[in-house]
């Protein structure tokens, strides 16, 4: 009934298995990849014809995690998986980026890749397994895909690269000092296609070494996919790229000069207008049939690409007139919004980001319900890219995949320099509003985010800057590496290479390569050129602010941390939370207690923090024997009076300890609610407190000294 094919190999510390032919047989290709006990099913389907008027490649990748894979039931009211989580969105992009450039040029049929996590062993991250499964499913499906690819995760521990570290070591690098790198690399047999990473100030050589290590380690996986395809692959889809050479010749003859003049304009909006006019002029020379040719868009893009690329490689001349290694003019400002906790406006050429920092308490931490466990995050970064930033009318609503991806890239770049939670017990939220964009807006978010946090008083270990690099590689092997690329250079180039870090090293690296042939030497040159650009940007940023402010904004919360014995937690909380509610209501401060006895008291008002601190201290502190306290009479009985003298602590003043004379009843001199001065004499055999009034001057609160006997 099943024509099942299964291939297995040992890879790293576990066994990798690829199998097909048993499940989802109506898909064009379906492979279940299992690494350890983590299993991901990738199913591929594709349309047999191109939609009329389709002028782009409609590839869609969906990665989804099923809670049952880890033996969990989803939270929430509906108890089922709903909209994609951030992890699912980021992994979908992680798979999309290396496979997209490998489809045959000109193929514009719809392709759908769905990766479903079926089992998770809580050790091996499903993202790498999903990438391998997707590559294998595409390879056997018959779609014109020039793969296969494979992926690998690389760690860096004690000076050694580690293949596919376990999930627990990687999900929170900030709190794992032994692990300094989380890098994912994807590539074909001959070339690296994609890199995504977060790091702890590693050098350019260490990062390049990690990329090489990952590419070497994935080679057996590529061989395994090829071995599977030799047995299970379907007949290749008969696709012949359209020949539009005649159309391109007409387009070039009609508009090359005008298009070249348009690309010589340095101002973005003027250039866009001129390019649009050049396109219209070209269309006016074409027949009706040629204007409706589905390859017209490709012909126009080829003309634009040849003009831009030729000028850069042959003449060293960029669109805006800069040298290849020059960064656009930078303007940095901080503290521009009066009521926010921290703010910065970072402008680099025609790219601008307004980044705002908000400080919160433990109550503001983000709760993350992941397959490998539940945890909280106290650092959030949200990136917004409204249509007005590029002068367009467009969709405005919840963040899309691109916004989530760019925000995570900036998050990775900055989290390496954050102070430890024990030293800075605040939740930090950054929001990057991209107000102008002409390339590298995610790196503007990094620069603006660093300045904004320092403006808020966050004690960063070092400022962070980011720069986007580009590459143009010609067929004859000549190439040019571009620093701080524009949007058009990104669109028409062969590599998008974003590097962020401090003066000491790299904290984040993202690379997307669109062509084969990029050698380690080219990557090394790009990294060195990026370092020079990054150091220049850090110098420009330091003109605005070079370290965190010593004072918070008056509108930001202050947090005081105190440690209490764990056996006192119950006393601070009280029955049903009665005591802690009283502390919050009386002081006006927010109070958070964890299971280790660490208490965080937060308020924008210093007096509120002081009041809450004193109330908690009075509950957990032990009174000192021999010390004088001010107390209040809370109850009078025949044998004495009970006095509340130390927070919630009461003690007995025996009738014989009230005055230096005999009393018929304590009520002769005391009444409930009266303030008295008492000395703690000690504790009786049952631990009860013994107090005395008669040894204390009730006016001054001074202890009455016994007169020395006469000689």
From Swiss-Prot:
Top-rank lineage group of the source organism: Bacteria
SMART domains (UniProt xref): KH (SM00322), S1 (SM00316)
GO molecular function, one term: 3'-5'-RNA exonuclease activity
Transmembrane domains' residue ranges: none
Record-annotated KH domain positions: 557-616
EC class (word): transferase
Residues engaged in binding Mg(2+): 490, 496
GO terms of biological process kind: mRNA catabolic process; RNA processing
Residues covered by the S1 motif domain: 626-694
Alphabetic keyword roster: Cytoplasm, Magnesium, Metal-binding, Nucleotidyltransferase, RNA-binding, Transferase
Cofactor requirements of the protein: Mg(2+)
Catalysed reaction, written as an equation: RNA(n+1) + phosphate = RNA(n) + a ribonucleoside 5'-diphosphate
Cell compartments where the protein resides: Cytoplasm
Gene Ontology CC: cytosol
Record bears the keyword Cytoplasm: yes
Stored InterPro entries: ExoRNase_PH_dom1 (IPR001247), ExoRNase_PH_dom2 (IPR015847), ExoRNase_PH_dom2_sf (IPR036345), KH_dom (IPR004087), KH_dom_type_1 (IPR004088), KH_dom_type_1_sf (IPR036612), NA-bd_OB-fold (IPR012340), PNPase (IPR012162)
EC nos: 2.7.7.8
SUPFAM superfamilies recorded: Eukaryotic type KH-domain (KH-domain type I), Nucleic acid-binding proteins, Polynucleotide phosphorylase/guanosine pentaphosphate synthase (PNPase/GPSI), domain 3, Ribonuclease PH domain 2-like, Ribosomal protein S5 domain 2-like
Pfam families, per the entry: KH_1, PNPase, RNase_PH, RNase_PH_C, S1
Database matches in HAMAP family: PNPase
PANTHER family xref list: POLYRIBONUCLEOTIDE NUCLEOTIDYLTRANSFERASE, POLYRIBONUCLEOTIDE NUCLEOTIDYLTRANSFERASE 1, MITOCHONDRIAL
UniProt function note: Involved in mRNA degradation. Catalyzes the phosphorolysis of single-stranded polyribonucleotides processively in the 3'- to 5'-direction.
UniProt similarity note: Belongs to the polyribonucleotide nucleotidyltransferase family.
Protein name, as recorded: Polyribonucleotide nucleotidyltransferase
Source organism of this protein record: Dinoroseobacter shibae (strain DSM 16493 / NCIMB 14021 / DFL 12)
Upper classification of the organism: Bacteria, Pseudomonadati, Pseudomonadota, Alphaproteobacteria, Rhodobacterales
Primary gene name: pnp
């Amino acid at each position: 009934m099943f024509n099942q094919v299964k291939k297995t190999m040992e890879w790293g510390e576990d066994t990798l298995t690829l199998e097909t032919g048993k499940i989802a047989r109506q898909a064009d290709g379906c492979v279940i990849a299992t690494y350890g006990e983590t299993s991901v099913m990738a199913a591929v389907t594709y349309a047999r014809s191109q939609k009329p008027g389709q002028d782009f490649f409609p590839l869609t990748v969906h990665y989804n995690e099923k809670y049952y894979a880890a033996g969990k039931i989803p939270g929430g009211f509906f108890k089922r998986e709903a909209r994609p989580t951030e992890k699912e969105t980021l992994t979908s992009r992680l798979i999309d980026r290396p496979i997209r450039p490998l489809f045959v040029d000109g193929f514009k049929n719809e392709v759908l890749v769905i990766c479903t996590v079926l089992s998770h062993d809580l050790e091996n991250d499903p993202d790498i397994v999903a990438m391998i499964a997707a590559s294998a499913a595409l390879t056997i499906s018959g779609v014109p895909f020039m793969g296969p690819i494979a992926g690998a995760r690389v760690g860096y521990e004690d000076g050694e690269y580690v293949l596919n570290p376990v999930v627990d070591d990687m999900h929170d690098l900030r709190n794992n000092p032994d692990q300094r790198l989380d890098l994912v690399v994807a590539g074909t047999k001959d070339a690296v296609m994609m890199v995504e990473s977060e790091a702890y100030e590693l050098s350019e050589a260490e990062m390049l070494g990690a990329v090489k290590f990952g590419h070497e380690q994935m080679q057996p996986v590529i061989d395994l996919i090829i071995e599977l395809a030799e047995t299970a692959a379907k007949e290749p889809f008969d696709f012949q790229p359209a020949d539009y050479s005649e159309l391109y010749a007409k387009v070039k003859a009609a508009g090359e000069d005008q298009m070249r003049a348009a690309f010589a304009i340095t101002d973005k909006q003027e250039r866009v207008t001129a390019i649009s006019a050049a396109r219209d002029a070209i269309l006016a020379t074409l027949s009706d049939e040629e204007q409706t040719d589905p390859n017209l868009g490709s012909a126009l893009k080829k003309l634009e690409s040849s003009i831009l690329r030729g000028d850069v490689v042959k003449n060293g001349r960029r669109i805006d007139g800069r040298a290849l290694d020059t960064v656009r003019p930078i303007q940095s400002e901080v503290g521009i919004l009066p009521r926010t906790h921290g703010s910065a406006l970072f402008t680099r050429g025609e790219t601008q980001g307004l980044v705002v920092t908000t400080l919160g308490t433990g109550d503001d931490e983000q709760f993350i319900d992941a397959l490998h466990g539940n945890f909280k995050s106290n650092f959030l970064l949200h990136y917004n890219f409204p249509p007005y930033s590029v002068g367009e009318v467009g969709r405005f609503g919840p963040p899309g995949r691109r916004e989530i991806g760019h925000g995570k890239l900036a998050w990775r770049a900055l989290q390496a320099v954050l102070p430890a939670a024990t030293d800075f017990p605040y939740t930090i939220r950054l929001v990057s509003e991209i107000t102008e964009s002409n390339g590298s807006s995610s790196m503007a978010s990094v620069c603006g985010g660093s300045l904004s946090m320092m403006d808020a008083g966050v004690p960063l270990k070092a400022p962070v800057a980011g720069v986007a690099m580009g590459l143009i590689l010609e067929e004859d092997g000549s190439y040019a590496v571009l620093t701080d690329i524009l949007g058009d250079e990104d669109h028409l180039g062969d590599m998008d290479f974003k590097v962020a870090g401090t003066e000491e090293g790299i904290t984040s690296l993202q690379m997307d390569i669109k062509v084969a042939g990029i050698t380690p030497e080219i990557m090394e040159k790009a990294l060195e050129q990026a370092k020079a650009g990054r150091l220049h940007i850090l110098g420009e940023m330091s003109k605005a602010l070079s370290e965190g402010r010593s004072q918070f904004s008056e509108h930001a919360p202050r947090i005081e941390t105190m440690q209490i014995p764990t056996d006192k937690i119950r006393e601070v909380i009280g029955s049903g939370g009665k005591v802690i509610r009283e502390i919050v209501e009386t002081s006006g401060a927010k109070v958070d207690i964890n299971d280790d006895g660490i208490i965080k008291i937060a308020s924008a008002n210093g007096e509120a923090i002081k009041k809450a601190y004193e109330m908690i201290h009075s509950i957990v502190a032990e009174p000192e024997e021999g010390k004088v306290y001010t107390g209040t009479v809370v109850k009078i009985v025949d044998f004495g009076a009970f006095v509340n003298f130390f927070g919630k602590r009461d003690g007995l003043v025996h009738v014989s300890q009230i005055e230096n004379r005999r009393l018929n009843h304590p009520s002769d001199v005391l009444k409930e609610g009266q303030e008295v001065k008492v000395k703690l004499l000690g504790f009786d055999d049952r631990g009860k407190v013994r107090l005395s009034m008669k040894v204390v001057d009730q006016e001054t609160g001074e202890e009455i000294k016994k007169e020395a006997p006469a000689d």
